[in-house]
A protein has these predicted regions:
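Non-heme Fe(II) oxygenase metal-center motifs and adjacent flexible, charged/small-residue loops
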Residues: 1-210
Length: 210
């Protein structure tokens, strides 16, 4: 199946959702270099959820950071491992997120980027992004590296879920009536890509209130 074969499924012909195939390809290696620079100051770590479990996805942040621990889920400007502010978002991050959002019909000024690293066997359960202070802003999600199966549902956990293959350089934008949709990633399969045997996901959000 080619990437064009995956376009235009009925589930995503709806207000607020855009799948931008290959949108980040021209910036891919610069994005990876920016990730490496961030990780040098704020290493990847496996966060703990309130129930005590350990997330299979390794995470770090730029800008205002998303944090999970036994106390709950929240945003914090400080990296709890170092006690220092999270690294600033590189200009290439901000520019890409703004351009992708504009392509999808949104104005967007992100102030937080959660960086996820999926190794084979890692996954992300269905969830909503609801810890932010500005639901009028969209979510912009960038895929780099190994392909993954993205799950995108409705506003209720038991709503039907669409499975869609995401490839290196693809960007998904959702906002408006779809802003609080449940979404997740199925278990990553082993493979090889030019950037390595893993997948990066950059999730851009507007954390601060409007």
């Amino acid at each position: 199946m080619t990437q064009p074969d995956l376009l235009g499924t009925p589930e995503f012909e709806r207000a607020g959702v855009a799948i931008l195939r290959g949108f980040a390809l021209t910036d891919d290696m610069a994005l990876v270099a920016a990730i490496d620079a961030i990780v040098a100051n704020a290493p990847f770590r496996h966060m703990t959820v309130p129930g005590g479990g350990r997330m299979s996805v390794a995470m770090t942040n730029a800008g205002i950071g998303w944090v999970a621990d036994t106390k709950g889920y929240r945003y914090d400007r400080t990296d709890p491992l170092s006690g220092q502010p999270w690294p600033d978002m590189p200009s290439i991050f901000v520019d890409l997120a703004r351009r992708a959002a504009h392509e999808a019909g949104f104005n967007f000024a992100p102030d937080g980027c959660l960086i996820n690293r999926y190794e084979p066997g890692a996954k992300m359960g269905l969830h909503q992004d609801i810890n932010e202070g500005d639901y009028s802003a969209p979510i912009v999600s960038v895929s780099l590296g190994l392909p993954a199966t993205f799950q995108f549902g409705g506003l209720k956990r038991n709503d039907p879920v669409e499975k869609i293959a995401l490839h290196h350089g693809d960007v998904v934008v959702w906002g408006g009536p779809a802003r609080k949709s449940f979404h997740g990633v199925l278990t990553l399969k082993a493979g090889h890509h030019a950037i390595g045997g893993h997948r990066y996901n950059l999730t851009f959000r507007k954390v601060s209130p409007p």
